[in-house]
Amino acid sequence: HGGGPGVGPICVASHLVEFLPTHTMVKTGGEHGIHAVAAAPYGSVGMLPVTYGYLLMLGAEGLEMVTKMAILNANYLASSFEKLGFKILFKGSKGRVGHEMIWDCNMFNKEYGISELDIAKRLMDFGFHAPTLSFPVHGTLMVEPTESEPKEELDRFIEALKTIREEMIEVGEGKADKTDNVLKNAPHTHKVLTADEWSHAYLRSKAAYPLAWVAENKFWPQVGRVDDGYGDRNLMCTCDPLESSNDEK
């Protein structure tokens, strides 16, 4: 059972069997189980033929090859990030990682006031999906390049992180404002960047096109910075005001 599609089984000890979730149409679960927590009692069955087809097409040699490539890609990124000052956690005895890596970003927060969230959001301005945030360690980012990424794409990702590292240094040296900078305000949507009013202390071009190749094939973020975890912990009513019902009458 991983973090992807919910297709893997979840096992419990015998004394918990009677509390397993039930289902309205399929006989499953225990006598004291709660109502269904998923509409599909057998998980995401559609994933099974996909996995089976993947195994058949690759075969034993192919599976070994893609596994090697996934690990090679991950270690290529990890070694490159370490040269940029990123600390990689959970390395093996030989200093290598598996198919993914976790960067510790806490030192950047202490030195520059730039958090792992700011880095993840800024990556979106380069056209990259934000990495997994603060899992399984707080203040970290997790990246898994997979076996299918070409070296050119990995190099672009490294160049993006190098630029972000330089942007953090600009904040530390006072060349960029501590709160009004490209990292704290990322990601930048096309709506914000094309608005008539621009009050930030940096150029639109720096926000939108931090590198030349970004301008050649820009993937625009559709949503800007939101309140993130604050919205999860603080309920806010988005209903129309009560006065609106009186106005209708």
Predicted regions and their residues:
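Active-site PLP attachment segment
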Residues: H1-H23
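Short, solvent-exposed loop/turn segments at the edges of secondary structure
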Residues: G2-V7, G46, R96-G98, P136-H138
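Short, charged N-terminal helix-start/capping segments
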Residues: C11, E18-F19, K27, V66-L72
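Gly/Pro-rich active-site capping loops and adjacent beta-alpha segments
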Residues: T22-K27, H32
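Non-catalytic terminal extensions of PLP-dependent enzymes
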Residues: E31-A38, L55-K249
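PLP-dependent aminotransferase class I/II
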Residues: V37-Y52
